[in-house]
Each structure stands twice: as C-alpha cells, then as structure tokens.
C-alpha cells in the first residue's frame, strides 16, 4: 500500500487502553494537574473496544484499597460497588459428584474476602471512564492502537491508530479512513494481559532480561440469571480439584452471587498444562455438571459469555517498567496477584503510581520552560526527561510491591508441586510464616506441552445439552462479538504450513481446543488433505493463541477499532 498522509494530534500523555490501570493513571494525572495549577495538561486514552468497558472481563471480587485512595468518597459518587461479600467459601471437588469444604482457617489469608465487593468490573470501568471525562480526559473508544511511533533517538513518540476500511486483500476499500498519529511526551501502555504493543516493547527494549518467563491462565466466564430462591447475594465460592485434576492441569474456579439474581461463574486453567488434549472450554462445561455448581444453575438462564487470558507470573516475572518515552502499567506489565486471584486493585495502583511519576516529570519540565496543552510547541519537549524511572521507585516503595513480593512463591509452588502439595506450601507461606527463599518457574507455558505420543490420558467431553452445557459457537453469540468481515486477519501466522505439517502430528494442533471461541479448525478436504482454517470473526480477543501455540507461530494483532466482544455487565 502506498504511503498514507495521516493527521496527527498532540497530547502531553497518551494512554493505550481504557481499563482499570489506564483510567486510573489518566485520573491521577488530571487530579494532580488541577491541584497544582496545570489545568491545560492534556491526557488522551484510546480504547479498541466499541465503548469503555466493552472488552472488560473479570470475575470479579474487587478489593477497594486502590479505589479508596483514588476516590475516598467513591460511595457518595456512585461507584457501582453494591454487593459486599457476606460469605466466603472454598471447596475441593474430589470427584464428579463429591466435594469437601475447606475450613476457613485452612484457606490462605490472601484468599480471604472480608471487606471486598462482588462487582461487574466492566461497570466499574465504565464509571471510571465517566470520572475521567469529568476531569477532561479525552477518551476515544473504538480506536485501536496499531503501531508504536518512535523518535530518531529510539524513544517512544506515541502511537498510530489502526486504519479503517482495509479489505482482506490489504488494499483500501471505498470506506477507507486512515488512522491518526497521536504524539505525546509520554505514552503509557495499559492494554491488559499480553498486550500486542507491550509485547513488542518488552522485546525491543529487552525489558524482561532480568525476569522469569511470564505465566498465564485462560479465564472462561459465564453470567447466569438464576432462580431467586437459590440466590444468596454476596456469597463468594472458590475451589479446585475436579475436573482439572484428571489431566494434572493446575486450575481453579469461582462462583459469585452478585446483584439482581445474577451469578458470575467460571474457571481459570493455567496455560502451563502439558496434555495436548486438554480443552479448557469443555473443562468448564464439564465442571458445571458437578452437583455443587449445578444446584444453583438449574432453572436459570445463561445471559453472557466471555474469555480472557490472565497474567499470573507475579513478582518474579515483572519486566522493567519504564523505557524512553513511556511505561508499562497494569497487566501489560503483569501486576495481577494470583495468590488473591485479583488484579484490578493492583492494576489501578500501578496506574496511580505511574500517573504520579508522569505528572512530576511534566511539572519539572514546565518549571524549566516546557509547555503543556493541546497547542504546545513540541520542539521544546527536550526539557522533559525521556525515561520516568521515578515510576519504578514509587512502585518499590509501595504496598503494591510488598503485596506482590509476599505472594511471589504462590504460582511457582503450584506449578512445581501440584495442587495439593503446592496448596500446603502456600498455606504455610501465607498463614504460618514467610518461606525465606524464592521459587522460580523458568519454563514458558508454550514449552510445557507434551507431544500426543507422550501422554496416555485423553479426557472425555460429553456433548453439550444446550441447557446447562453449551458449545463454543452459541457461547460466542452471546458475547456479542462483531468484526468487520472484509478486513485482513488479525491472527498472523509466521509460517502457514506449521499448523498442519508440525502442530497437527506432534500435538494434534492444540489451537483447535485451547481457543475458547472456535477460531481455529483443522478442515479435511475432499481429497483427504488437511487445511488449517482461521475464523477470525469469532475472536473474543483473549490472546491465548499468542501465548500457548507450541511453535510460537501465531501473533495476535489488533483488528479494526470497535471490533471484538461487547460485554454487558461482565
């Protein structure tokens, strides 16, 4: 395609992603700007979802610690935290029909939820978006950040939003609209787990050279409306065991009773699993047939579905947080605390810490004659420091660092020792005394997969009944996923022959199973040959393929802005 002339816009700060971390950073910067008489300091947030909250998926039980700091009067301001946790239970599923409730004293303290709230994180984020706009943050939903822009010295200059109206052949259609260049003093990347631009930045600046490999899980969620007689508002249930234990997969589940007779339920399967026959979506469907879970769902109706990879490497896997011209925040860096099964409060805190550091850097530049605002003179930007290392220092001195450090062994213990022994290790580490050493998990998730001839067990997944259990296509339908059909695939293969020639014979092409949206298929042609088919329009942007493909042959890039799921109340 020929060179395209693009319009550009200048901001002091550009933030990629309107999730908990991105919006918290934007809010903190604008709060400080107003308090310190820099009202013209401009902040822009771009969001690839059709609206703020459209791509937000979480359990969620929210710990309000960071929110208390950002908005001490959040209750009076109408934040949608309406259901305090009233009961907190943990279970071991011993088989497909039996279970055992764990005494509260046996549960690691990190998983105690007194003082927390059952929420729709999507609705919390929508509220944060409103608060950001009240502070005059420019929030642009429906604009996907597709490229990173660089200065000649290698520092980040900003981002380019994706072109609209490019056909499958890569050529402009009659609907073509070029993307914008958004330039900034500082660009913050808040894309969530496995952000495609964050991934590039980590590689380009070698930000993970001193970190353990990052680790991930796939979270699969359903929202149900249940019989009011069975609903117990504020009841929080977590558990592990069956069905994951049958394949040796580390994983767990949740079931939360929210407001309006709704329950949020789902599973998280660690992507370190080694059996190529594991099918996380069907593991969830099978899990719902357990009597402990089924009792709540019978007579109810499934109203929404979604899936998203979660980052779980924690303290040991954090990359360097800063680089010239920008920072990584939230799950783009990996701040989720898996020992709590929570990342919203940590994402928010990382954004707030970064926001403080960014504001201080801008204020220092202004004191030396630099300008702020939409109409500033960009040639004067050399008075502003390039790399805001103060963000790292603020993190090091914060409760966020302390919380992640204290939980650093949780994930590695589960991976090294399994659910039962690892669980015992974590009980001692969290409830009795701190283990005085650090465990490391140095095998990337994609390398954990064994070949089909090296495993003996193949799970049996019953056919869905359409009432309690479902297939992937009907599930994607209620995720409200929409993409422009006539656009290039956003799922890029480095080598188109690998799925059939390498992955199929070695691992029975696991993309057929690890994708929770049915994007990848092996199709048999009339002549008996096999073909790898990508149904990109089904994609719910979970990023599992980018993580788990054993050949690391699939790269997820952003499709047109506004595409993907449209999660309501998730």
Show which residues each predicted segment covers.
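FAD-binding beta-loop-beta segment adjacent to the flavin cofactor pocket
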Residues: 307-338, 475-486, 499-514, 521
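N-terminal FAD cofactor-binding segment of flavoenzymes
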Residues: 40-41, 46-97
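Predominantly flavin-linked oxidoreductase catalytic cores and closely associated redox partners
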Residues: 38-39, 122, 126-127, 131-295, ...
């Amino acid at each position: 395609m020929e060179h395209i002339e693009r319009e550009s816009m200048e901001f002091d700060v550009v933030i990629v992603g309107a999730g908990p971390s991105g919006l918290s950073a934007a809010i903190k910067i604008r709060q400080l700007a107003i308090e310190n008489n820099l009202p013209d300091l401009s902040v822009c947030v771009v969001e690839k979802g059709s609206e703020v909250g459209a791509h937000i998926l979480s359990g969620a039980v929210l710990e309000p610690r960071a929110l208390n700091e950002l908005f001490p009067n959040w209750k009076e301001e109408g934040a949608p935290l309406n259901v305090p946790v009233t009961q907190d239970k943990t279970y071991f599923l011993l088989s497909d029909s039996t279970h055992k409730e764990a005494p509260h004293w046996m549960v690691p303290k990190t998983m105690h939820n007194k003082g927390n709230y059952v929420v729709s994180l999507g609705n919390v984020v929508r509220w944060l978006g409103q608060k950001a706009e009240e502070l005059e943050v420019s929030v642009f939903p429906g604009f996907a950040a597709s490229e990173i822009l660089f200065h000649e010295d290698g520092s980040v200059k900003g981002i380019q939003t994706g072109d609209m109206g490019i056909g499958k052949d890569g050529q402009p259609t009659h609907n073509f609209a070029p993307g914008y260049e958004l330039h900034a003093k500082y660009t913050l990347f808040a894309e969530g787990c496995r952000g495609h631009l964050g991934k590039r930045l980590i590689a380009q600046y070698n930000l993970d050279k001193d970190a353990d490999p990052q680790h991930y899980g796939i979270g699969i969620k359903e929202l149900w409306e249940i019989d009011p007689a069975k609903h117990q508002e504020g009841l929080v249930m977590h558990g592990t065991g069956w069905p994951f234990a049958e394949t040796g997969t580390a994983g767990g589940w949740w079931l939360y009773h929210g407001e309006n007779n709704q329950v949020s339920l789902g599973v998280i399967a660690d992507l370190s699993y080694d059996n190529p026959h594991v099918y996380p979506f069907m593991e969830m469907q099978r899990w719902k047939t357990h009597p402990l879970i089924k009792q709540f769902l019978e007579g109810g109706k499934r109203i929404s579905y979604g899936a998203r990879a979660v980052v779980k490497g924690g303290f040991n896997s954090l990359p360097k947080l800063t680089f010239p011209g920008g920072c990584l925040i939230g799950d783009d860096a990996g701040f989720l605390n898996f020992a709590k099964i929570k990342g919203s409060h940590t994402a928010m805190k990382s954004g707030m810490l970064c926001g403080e550091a960014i504001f201080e850097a801008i204020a220092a530049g202004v004191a030396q004659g630099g300008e702020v605002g939409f109409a500033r003179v960009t040639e004067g930007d050399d008075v502003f420091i390039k790399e805001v290392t103060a963000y790292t220092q603020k993190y090091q001195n914060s409760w966020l660092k302390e919380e992640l450090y204290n939980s650093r062994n949780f994930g590695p213990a589960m991976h090294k020792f399994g659910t039962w022994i690892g669980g015992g290790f974590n009980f001692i580490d969290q409830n009795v005394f701190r283990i005085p050493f650090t465990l490391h998990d140095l095998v990337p998730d994609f390398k954990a997969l064994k070949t089909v001839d090296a495993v003996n067990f193949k799970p049996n997944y019953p056919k869905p009944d359409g009432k309690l259990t479902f297939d992937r296509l009907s599930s994607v339908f209620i995720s409200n996923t929409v993409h422009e059909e006539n656009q290039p695939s956003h799922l890029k293969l480095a080598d188109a022959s690998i799925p059939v020639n390498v992955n199929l014979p070695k691992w029975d092409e696991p993309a057929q199973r690890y994708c929770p949206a049915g994007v990848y298929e092996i199709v048999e042609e009339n002549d008996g040959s096999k073909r790898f088919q990508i149904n990109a329009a089904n994609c719910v942007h979970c990023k599992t393929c980018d993580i788990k493909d054993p050949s690391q042959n699939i790269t997820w890039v952003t499709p047109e802005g506004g595409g993907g799921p449209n999660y309501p109340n998730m």
